[in-house]
């Protein structure tokens, strides 16, 4: 392999030999981030030179008899600047979203009299590879002049939107908004039954917020889909 630069090319071995001092590779590069320190008068600061952005969506199946939520498909799109290592990017996104799905659907520390009753991996439900849906990591391949080599972070940001994406998908599938995590079967089933009981008692007239849901569902097969997708 040869490294090509502005003044020519050299083999990787030649470059390593030139950069080594006493057998230690010493070629380094520093990137000075454009940040703003804390202003004691305003309390404002900018501790990052570049900010990443992400959006996620999932497709779910909700069993109305058991309350079990199954994620069928997942996509995670990121503005992480220049992706220097595509394989590392994809692995990071898949791993981060797997953690997010675990937090959204099952991970929870349970306590009894102030003591955790599921403190080990024997009884703490982490998702396994076989539990995961297809996860599609995508990058918009932007470039940020403030990031090293135009790159931006793709770390914790993967985990942040996952639970919201799952909760939104469940709400879209059932019409019931659940605002507490994780979305365990008992919690989902309880919310569905409570919603059914309220619907029988009050109907649409007693819950105006559901008029638009019922209207969209009735109009969609009657041509609304074509209007929205023009």
Model regions: which residues?
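C-terminal catalytic domains of large/alpha subunits in multi-subunit enzymes
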Residues: 1-230
């Amino acid at each position: 392999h040869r490294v090509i630069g502005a003044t020519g090319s050299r083999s990787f071995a030649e470059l390593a030999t030139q950069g080594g001092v006493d057998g230690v590779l010493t070629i380094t590069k520093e990137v000075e981030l454009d940040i703003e320190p804390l202003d004691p008068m305003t309390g404002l600061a900018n501790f990052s030179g570049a900010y990443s952005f992400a959006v996620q969506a999932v497709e779910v199946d909700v069993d109305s008899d058991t309350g079990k939520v199954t994620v069928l498909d997942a996509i995670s799109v990121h503005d992480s600047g220049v992706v220097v290592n595509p394989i590392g990017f994809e692995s990071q996104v898949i791993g981060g979203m797997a953690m997010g799905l675990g937090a959204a659907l099952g991970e929870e520390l349970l306590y009894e009299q102030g003591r955790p009753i599921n403190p080990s991996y024997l009884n703490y439900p982490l998702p396994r590879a076989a539990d995961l849906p297809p996860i599609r990591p995508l990058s918009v391949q932007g470039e940020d002049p403030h990031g090293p080599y135009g790159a931006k972070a793709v770390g914790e940001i993967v985990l942040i939107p996952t639970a919201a994406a799952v909760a939104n998908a469940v709400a879209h599938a059932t019409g019931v908004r659940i605002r507490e995590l994780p979305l365990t079967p008992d919690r989902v089933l309880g919310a569905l039954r409570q919603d059914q009981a309220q619907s029988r008692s009050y109907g649409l007239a007693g819950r105006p917020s559901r008029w638009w849901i019922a209207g969209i569902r009735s109009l969609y097969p009657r041509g609304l889909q074509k209007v929205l997708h023009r």
